[in-house]
A protein has these predicted regions:
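Leloir-type glycosyltransferase catalytic cores
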Residues: 57, 158, 332-380
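A nucleotide-sugar donor-handling region in carbohydrate enzymes
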Residues: 47-51, 70, 148-222, 334
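A donor-sugar binding/catalytic signature common to diverse glycosyltransferases
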Residues: 101-102, 113, 124, 152, ...
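Glycine-rich phosphate-binding loop signature in dinucleotide/nucleotide-binding domains
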Residues: 90-97, 201-202, 291, 377
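Conserved nucleotide-sugar phosphate-binding/catalytic loop shared by glycosyltransferases and other
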Residues: 33-79
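Catalytic binding pocket for nucleotide-activated donors in carbohydrate/polymer assembly enzymes
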Residues: 308-343, 347-349
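Donor-nucleotide binding loops and adjacent catalytic segments primarily
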Residues: 36, 54, 191-291
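Active-site and donor-binding regions of nucleotide-sugar-utilizing enzymes
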Residues: 5-8, 13-31, 55-56, 68-167
Length: 380
């Protein structure tokens, strides 16, 4: 038997760890006489809206966290330090054989550092992704975590090459596919059937917007440039904007509130305009994304999900650590340039957008491959 600590800190982490936990449960059920995996789910609480987290745990059929830190907000250094201190204590207490971290958030970095100093093996899910932009905090997190990890599970062959160029030995790199797509493919039909109230929206008759990165929402000049593009686009179609609490705060602070229409029911989205709503659960968001004409985002995971769904995506960033979504998928980088955002949006609205294909091994079986490798490496 192997004892594993699974770390999550933000909502995107939940979609990545859920398939791995589900697979561990399947393995244990199939080997009832000899339990293979003992795991604990550690939630650092890096995303501090408990209601938002609860929605995702429920939709993804995940058990509640075994350990919750409640770290909440703070600077990058404050969050990282607090998590390291708490996670080190958990490692001393639980004595895990392996720690699984996912993605590139501060929780990923903090738990990796604490784990490595105790000489406990680390498995990094989504290893090798690079934007080559060190002004992004996530890039620093990715690079350090990969250096410290014993098992690097990658989503694409580009990531393998990035790791090799950085001197990571080949025997630590494993191309397994994309776990967030495991969740998407598993729950897509369930989301469609459960979220019937959203079906009053006409399919492909609206744009879905997400915007949360500090480089976009904390900079008034950049936010205004994006905002002015949204106003132009919203003159011809509905833009649905499930806004993170922090983004809503910056909208008010910058005085951008007036053109946003706060809507309590999705039945009113037939109207043109920018419709600001509270954050959604996983099923609701997945349904909206799947049926959108276009998605505007600065998220990383959404670039991947839209590629698999075949939904055009415009990424409001100057670079991406997921270039495969551009080379093979439906994604286009538009940055924060107003004219480019408007031009590419109208191209898609006029049915002239790019089409893509599903990348290699994005087939819903990444978590199976990950656990097969762990079983082999630990001689289980």
């Amino acid at each position: 038997m192997i004892k594993i600590l699974c770390v999550v800190g933000t909502r995107p982490n939940f979609m990545k760890i859920a398939p791995i936990i589900n697979q561990m449960e399947k393995y244990n059920s199939a080997h009832s006489l000899k339990k293979i995996f003992e795991y604990l789910l550690v939630h650092t609480g890096q995303h501090y809206d408990d209601n938002m987290s609860d929605y995702f745990f429920k939709d993804l059929q995940m058990p509640p966290p075994d350990i919750y830190f409640g770290i909440s907000s703070g600077t990058h250094s404050e969050q990282t330090a607090k998590i390291m201190i708490k996670f080190e204590k958990i490692c001393f207490q639980e004595k895990p054989d392996l720690v699984i971290v996912v993605g590139d958030v501060n929780s990923t970095l903090a738990c990796s550092i604490a784990t490595a100093k105790l000489l406990i093996p680390i498995a990094h899910v989504e290893a090798g992704l690079r934007s080559f932009d060190k002004t992004m905090p996530e890039e620093i997190n990715r690079m350090i975590t990969d250096t410290l990890s014993e098992y690097l599970f990658t989503t694409c062959r580009d990531a393998n090459e990035n790791l090799k160029k950085e001197g990571i030995p080949k025997n630590r790199i494993f191309f397994v596919g994309n776990v967030i797509i495991d969740s998407l493919l598993k729950y897509k039909e369930l989301a469609d059937s459960k979220v019937k109230n959203l079906n009053k929206l006409k399919n492909k008759d609206y744009i879905l917007l997400t915007l949360h990165r500090p480089c976009n929402v904390d900079n008034k000049k950049i936010f205004r440039e994006i905002f002015e593009a949204l106003i132009e686009i919203s003159k011809v179609t509905s833009i649905i904007f499930p806004a993170h609490p922090r983004t809503q705060k910056m909208i008010k602070e910058f005085g951008f509130s007036c053109p946003f229409q706060k809507i309590l029911t999705l039945n009113l989205f037939q109207m043109k305009g920018i419709h600001l709503i509270s954050p959604l659960g996983y099923f609701e968001f997945l349904n909206l994304m799947d049926n959108a004409k276009l998605v505007l985002t600065d998220s990383g995971g959404i670039q991947e999900e839209t590629t698999v769904l075949g939904v055009p995506c415009l990424t409001l960033r100057e670079n991406t650590e997921r270039p495969i979504t551009i080379k093979e998928g439906t994604n286009i980088l538009v940055g924060s340039n107003k004219d480019k955002i408007i031009k590419e949006s109208f191209t898609i609205l006029n049915d002239r957008g790019k089409t893509g294909k599903i990348p290699e091994l994005w087939d819903g079986k990444a978590s199976q491959r990950i656990l097969s490798i762990i079983i082999s490496k630990f001689n289980l």
